[in-house]
Amino acid sequence: MIDRKDTNRFKLVSKYSPSGDQPQAIETLVDNIEGGEKAQILKGATGTGKTYTMSQVIAQVNKPTLVIAHNKTLAGQLYGEFKEFFPDNAVEYFVSYYDYYQPEAYVPSSDTYIEKDSSVNDEIDKLRHSATSSLLERNDVIVVASVSCIYGLGSPKEYADSVVSLRPGQEISRDQLLNNLVDIQFERNDIDFQRGKFRVRGDVVEVFPASRDEHAFRIEFFGDEIDRIREIESLTGRVLGEVEHLAIFPATHFMTNDEHMEEAISKIQAEMENQVELFEKEGKLIEAQRIRQRTEYDIEMLREMGYTNGVENYSRHMDGRSEGEPPFTLLDFFPEDFLIMIDESHMTMGQIKGMYNGDRSRKEMLVNYGFRLPSALDNRPLRREEFESHVHQIVYVSATPGDYEMGQTDTVVEQIIRPTGLLDPEVEVRPSMGQMDDLLGEINLRTEKGERTFITTLTKRMAEDLTDYLKEMGVKVKYMHSDIKTLERTEIIRDLRLGVFDVLIGINLLREGIDVPEVSLVAILDADKEGFLRNERGLIQTIGRAARNSNGHVIMYADKITDSMQRAMDETARRRRLQMDYNEKHGIVPQTIKKEIRDLIAITKSNDSDKPEKVVDYSSLSKKERQAEIKALQKQMQEAAELLDFELAAQIRDVILKLKAID
């Protein structure tokens, strides 16, 4: 039994109070949520304090909240900020726990089976367990997640029913407790005591919960009764205090009791026989033998150990779901009345839409060639419409909301005024002829004042050439390309802020979520090349990178002004006018943001995002552009396959399928 606390309240801790148009945005969002509004958009300009507004809304509506970001880096930034705002509440982090992940796959052309291979980040696994246990124990929970939250996780009911509940005075034998711990996938290890393990010393059992990393629990027996329970330091054994109730959550999210396990095994056997019969009828004898051999091995492991590698592929039978029924996910661990906030929604909602198709095409190949039963297709991410069915109330947060969000609601709450009085930058267009010399002069002006520069190009080749040119001219410059992993990227941004170098060049990496107040100039090369990097939303996001410095300035190098450029400049000018009027009315002088340069947080040491690095709003492409992109990606996929880099090839293929899925 779990002692759930439903009366906790969120307590926001901040030295700031709402300012600019934050008070109006907070009040409107809260009133709409309390009035039962299902969906609304917070359209907040870069640097207006959207995260602070989100925190105020969470504190006032006091509902468990899921915040979804489109990659681990942004999720990590948000997690750190929410932890600071809510030190007394449960702020949790839920992203893919793989440092390295090669999905199970089969390549028919070369008859190559690629076994699933992965490396799990222990720190992130701990944080995932902490998230699910917090959701079942209390109401004041914020979970910051990536799109991993729409992947299958196991039944929350089985997970909750498997919790081992202990109290002083409870009658239970030591051996019964040991059996219970093994049933919920804890391992006995009297020497190497770490998460998900227990050790035994006479009448004393010490348990290290899967959601902790420093503190464990010591259960002392007197006969067949628990004498007392103490919290201890796992390393030193020092007693920290006595505990009146201890709930030990399972060491895995995929739990099934013995009764359900036997039912599941019967269904797996029946499905295997049907599949073998089907293959034999079609003359596919190798596939028939393969699926029987693999499935019988898994069944034996399930009977003996209660677990097998790839157990998630049998989750439909384990959970008692029907064919095609959506899997249980993190969303099912929340109570019905919870709040969802989608950060950078114009990117995140596109990811949520694209997850299902890429996963299914890979699994169908495994099923067709006898590596997996058809039920493996139901171990999958949610479709977008299934995600929508979980939504009770949702706030889309973006400076540039996408068409999908705009189609979901007419309620748009604008947040344009920055608490610092900073204005949207001035934007000017200059001819591309002679742009290198012109740009070099602008960079030198900024460097002399101790300011930094962002340059965004359209191609990798141009970025590399420009980097070489600027280095020859004596400029301290770095190029941030898509091969750079999360931790390195964070280090590069930190070095830029510290002045190790002055200019950062990128392609699609200098948009959402990169906040460097020292940057006063953003240069956009080939601004008139209409496409997914130079559409209205992309340009507004890029312009926003200069909005955290009082000297913010944007130069677009182009030979003509496209419709996207004009709309982006018009929107920036509209915001700038409103901001200037507000400053004049209230006597505010714009001040560059003073942002502490933090040490790298541990969770950013995980390896990159859940999806291929190239995350793009494909819905904005024309049909012709999509076809060209597909052709280019297919070539890259073939090259990766020839080099036996099947993981990269599979990632590129998923992007191609996402492109093809667009109507």
Curated annotation (Swiss-Prot):
Its main location: cytoplasm. InterPro entries: Helicase/UvrB_N (IPR006935), Helicase_ATP-bd (IPR014001), Helicase_C-like (IPR001650), P-loop_NTPase (IPR027417), UVR_dom (IPR001943), UVR_dom_sf (IPR036876), UvrB (IPR004807), UvrB_inter (IPR041471). Residues 31-418 form the Helicase ATP-binding domain. SMART domains: DEXDc, HELICc. GO terms for molecular function: ATP binding; ATP hydrolysis activity; DNA binding; excinuclease ABC activity. A motif (Beta-hairpin) lies at residues 97-120. Residues 627-662 form the UVR domain. It holds the Pfam family UvrB. GO terms for cellular component: cytoplasm; excinuclease repair complex. Belongs to the UvrB family. Forms a heterotetramer with UvrA during the search for lesions. Interacts with UvrC in an incision complex. The beta-hairpin motif is involved in DNA binding. This is UvrABC system protein B. The lineage of its organism: Bacteria, Bacillati, Bacillota, Bacilli, Lactobacillales.
